[in-house]
Regions:
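Signature for phosphate-centric chemistry
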Residues: 1-102, 106-170
Length: 170
């Protein structure tokens, strides 16, 4: 779909899969840039696009989630972050504290290990890295703008309760 002269394209492109991978990477990035109004992925056949999506999901799952191969290592990368959350929550709950909120901003690659460590939803389940796409896709589980909220409050008895929301879902 990208070339009008198929023979010339085959002559210029020595490694077809590498080329498709490069077009996929650029096309994926363009989807995040609305002002470009550019959809490069429409030029890739679905048969070539689908394996790209599978491989990307598998790799990201293996590197950042609770995969059978690397989950313990990935989850440990969130130890300090969780400890920081809990210490700030403890400080906010102390008598006389005026702290109402702590906001943190990060990236999906920081959120995924934290959710695995805490045992939250799909990110707590262990799959093998290869084939993880059969169970979940990155864009479904950790879409752009993903968020995690821990809301601490006291009930009428004075007990501390925590409401946790992942992408606005309890």
């Amino acid at each position: 779909k990208l070339f009008t002269d198929k023979r010339k394209a085959e002559e210029l492109i020595k490694k077809r899969q590498d080329f498709v991978n490069s077009v996929y990477m650029v096309g994926s990035s363009c989807l995040d840039l609305d002002y470009l109004n550019l959809d490069i992925l429409k030029y890739i056949d679905i048969e070539e696009l689908t394996p790209q999506v599978y491989v990307r999901s598998d790799r990201l799952y293996g590197a950042c989630c609770n995969s059978a191969e690397y989950g313990d290592v990935s989850n440990c990368s969130a130890d300090d972050l969780l400890a920081d959350f809990l210490s700030k929550a403890d400080a906010a709950l102390e008598d006389g504290s005026r702290r109402a909120a702590d906001l943190r901003f990060g990236h999906d690659t920081g959120l995924m290990p934290l959710m695995g460590l805490m045992g939250v939803n799909e990110l707590a389940v262990q799959y093998n890295m290869v084939g993880a796409h059969e169970h979940w896709f990155t864009y479904d589980v950790v879409p752009m703008g993903s968020n995690f909220q821990m809301i601490f409050y006291r009930n009428k008895k004075g007990n501390v309760l925590v409401k946790m929301l992942y992408n606005e879902q309890e």
